[in-house]
From Swiss-Prot:
Main function: Catalyzes the transfer of the 2-phospholactate moiety from (2S)-lactyl-2-diphospho-5'-guanosine to 7,8-didemethyl-8-hydroxy-5-deazariboflavin (FO) with the formation of oxidized coenzyme F420-0 and GMP.
Pathway: Cofactor biosynthesis; coenzyme F420 biosynthesis
Reactions that this protein is recorded to catalyse: (2S)-lactyl-2-diphospho-5'-guanosine + 7,8-didemethyl-8-hydroxy-5-deazariboflavin = oxidized coenzyme F420-0 + GMP + H(+)
Name of the protein described by the UniProt record: 2-phospho-L-lactate transferase
Gene3D superfamilies: CofD-like domain, CofD-like domains
EC number: 2.7.8.28
GO biological process, one term: F420-0 metabolic process
Chain positions recorded as 7,8-didemethyl-8-hydroxy-5-deazariboflavin binding sites: D49
The species this protein was found in: Methanosphaerula palustris (strain ATCC BAA-1556 / DSM 19958 / E1-9c)
HAMAP family: CofD
Subunit and partners: Homodimer.
Amino acid sequence: MITVLSGGTGTPKLLRGLHALVPDEEITVVVNTAEDLWISGNHLSPDVDTVIYLYAGLLNTDTWWGIRGDTFLTHEALVPLSANEFIAIGDQDRAVHIARGEMLRNGSTLTEATRHLCRSFGVKARVLPMSDAPVGTMVATENGLIHFQEYWIRHHGQVPITSVVRQPERFEASQAVLEALMECDAVIVGPSNPVTSIGPILECIWVPDLLREKPVIAVSPFIGDAPISGPAAALMKASGVEPSSLGTFGLYRDFVDIFVQDIRDPVAVPGAVRCDTLMKDQEKSTALAAEVLSLMKSLA
């Protein structure tokens, strides 16, 4: 059994490769939920949904979010009616948010709601939100704290930020996540944003302790000297971390056994394994996944 720590953009590309090589039933994906929020009355869990849609064969892999071929009629109708509708949510995607919101309002945990959605979509991989507690990533601007989604989507990451804040400061991993980490044979830390995607998972109580007991392979999100997607560099700077593979390794060094960085990366991480981590298509995703699995066998 393999457990993968994932955000919503970089790591799903690696999951695409693992999907081609490993039976879905042997994969557990622990997913960041610190970017979740309620919007237009419904519960958005973007990283969880990306992983569900990937394994369901529905993901829009042009954008790496949402459902392929979705329409946006409800969003277009809501925009003039709601100041809060700042994210373009597809109609089928919104149906998932509505269903999840209803389950949460009726007393289900996020883990239970996610399990129900996976069953509904026929997903065989085990997809686990990192925590059942509400967690939010906020960024500090000159006008105060704003949610990460507002910073990245509404303001396109163009607002100067001074720090990254998690609310609340302490939160627990779900029992299902703790069990998955205890029972798995190895852990892959995917190439997602180390501050806003992987960071919240690592901040869950007990998670770092469990990782130290397992073989762990981490893949840097940096291609060359820049992250392939998202605002990782700006967020790492605001967190006081060097925006590079070396800075990423520094966040993981306490538990990682093998660190993988891109062949084009000019910043050398001592002891790192060099691979082509630019997963621009299925073939590239599968090739990197095969490399990671081979490295995993070397740790057995």
